[in-house]
Amino acid sequence: MFARQAFRCAQPLKQGFRKYSTEAPKGKSSLAPIYAAVGITGVGVGLYRYNSATAEAPAAVDRPKVFKGGDQGWFDLKLSEIEVLNHNTKRLRFEFEDKEALSGLQVASALLTKFKPADAKAVIRPYTPTSDEETPGYIDLVVKVYPNGPMSEHLHSMNVGQRLDFKGPIVKYPWETNKHNHICLIAGGTGITPMYQLAREIFKNPEDQTKVTLVFGNVKEEDILLKKEFEELENTYPRRFRAFYVLDNPPKEWTGGKGYISKELLKTVLPEPKEENIKIFVCGPPGMYKAISGTKNSPTDQGELSGILKELGYSKEQVFKF
């Protein structure tokens, strides 16, 4: 796979990747067979895929929306399915009362979750759903359990049939078709969820020709979340999507990046700061923010740019911290 072979020789990678970053996209006629092959021919077909047992599915614009924001307030959803992804991560599916309803989320946005332990204050945490916004009936959350993390521990302790309070959506970075020529997603751990939401939105839209580069750091190989989904994107759109994986504790046979996401790696795989209309997104644990981009001052204040990205010459306007 490209992502694993790429680290074997940094200089050829750099040359090849710069070419990838600046090459013109294929014409619409050459892309048409690809979109037809994967079934991406518009919202109607995407919705039909989820309702194949029925006649023609109603258009997305006609479906009710569950999350409306504003003064809607908190409401609860029932946990309907649990999938164990690895030793510390689960995919939790929460179903809507109306199975034809859509979430109402836009890309990129998150939801607030809440639960109140006995004799303690309510715990509120944001999560980015990984389910498609155009899929009716449910939302999926990918949740990694953290020691002494009250919300993640609560979510991992839940059983099918139990309920959880939600509120939202919280819009983080409103995406528009072809908003940028090239975006770069630098993620660590469960910071991958908003990155996947953004990448999925781009590649399911035939009109969006944005190029996407993913740099994803984890501790062990089994910690790489949504790897199957990203490999599918890489195989389907090799001209527009590249993924690079870095492990702090790799297995002996690992041929990808080792250690932490480094300045040398980012200098090699990211587009140069002088390129037009690029955007770099960062999401991960506090230590990664500090090293890569600097931390946010608050949910509404991006703070100053620092760390590796500043050292490489990127501007504050070219970087967004989830």
Curated annotation (Swiss-Prot):
Annotated residues for binding of FAD: 179-214
All residue ranges annotated as the FAD-binding FR-type domain in the record: 72-176
Organism classification:
Eukaryota, Fungi, Dikarya, Ascomycota, Pezizomycotina
Name of the top EC class for this enzyme: oxidoreductase
Alphabetically sorted, this entry's keywords are: FAD, Flavoprotein, Membrane, Mitochondrion, Mitochondrion outer membrane, NAD, Oxidoreductase, Transmembrane, Transmembrane helix
PANTHER family documented for this protein: NADH-CYTOCHROME B5 REDUCTASE, NADH-CYTOCHROME B5 REDUCTASE 2
Protein name per its UniProtKB record: NADH-cytochrome b5 reductase 2
CDD domains, alphabetically?
Answer: cyt_b5_reduct_like
**EC nos:** 1.6.2.2
Required cofactors, per record? FAD
**In terms of one coarse class, where is the protein primarily found?**
mitochondrion
Domain of life of the source: Eukaryota
